[in-house]
Curated annotation (Swiss-Prot):
GO cellular component: cytosolic large ribosomal subunit
Protein's GO biological process: translation
This protein's UniProt keywords: Ribonucleoprotein, Ribosomal protein
Assembly mode: Part of the 50S ribosomal subunit. Contacts protein L32.
GO MF terms, alphabetically ordered: structural constituent of ribosome
Source organism: Francisella philomiragia subsp. philomiragia (strain ATCC 25017 / CCUG 19701 / FSC 153 / O#319-036)
Entry keyword annotation includes Transferase: no
Gene: rplQ
Similarity annotation: Belongs to the bacterial ribosomal protein bL17 family.
Name the UniProt record assigns to this protein: Large ribosomal subunit protein bL17
Keyword Ribonucleoprotein: yes
Length: 145
């Protein structure tokens, strides 16, 4: 019986699957929008949302404690190390803690959105965009003739 077995295998070894989701998590944090298959997007959501919660905890500590206190520094470093332990990407960890903690401070979960976008041309796999909610909209450049 498959009781209490969380996640899908995606036809990969455990090390390949783990590396794939670490890379996808870092890409989602850096770009805030990625296109992938629908099952991978659903699995990625369960990985990224706890990372954003770590950033929120650090932001909450920043407001409660003195930033120069040893207690804040110790807890902040511990939270960043937890995130780095999974992501292994300094740029992604920095962006996670400096931008997302403040951005999602008032939101109680649900930091990602999955939008279905049809089927892949080669094998008809269902595709989806996964994006971070409340991301800043980039205005497209308008050509002037």
């Amino acid at each position: 019986m498959r009781h209490r077995k969380k996640g899908s295998k995606f036809g990969r070894t455990s090390s390949h699957r783990k590396a794939m989701f670490k890379n996808m998590s870092a890409s989602l944090i850096n770009h805030e929008l990625i296109k992938t298959t629908l099952p991978k997007a659903k699995e990625l959501r369960t990985i990224v949302e706890p990372l954003v919660t770590l950033a929120k905890r650090e932001f909450k500590l920043r407001n409660e404690l003195d930033v120069n206190s040893n207690e804040f520094k110790a807890q902040s470093v511990a939270l960043r190390r937890q995130a780095f332990d999974f992501l292994r990407n300094k740029a992604a960890v920095t962006k996670l803690f400096e931008e997302f903690g403040a951005r999602y401070a008032e939101r109680a979960g649900g930091y990602t959105r999955i939008l279905k976008c049809g089927y892949r041309f080669g094998d008809k796999a269902p595709m989806a965009f996964i994006e971070l909610v409340d991301r800043p909209q980039v205005e497209e450049a308008v050509e002037v003739e």
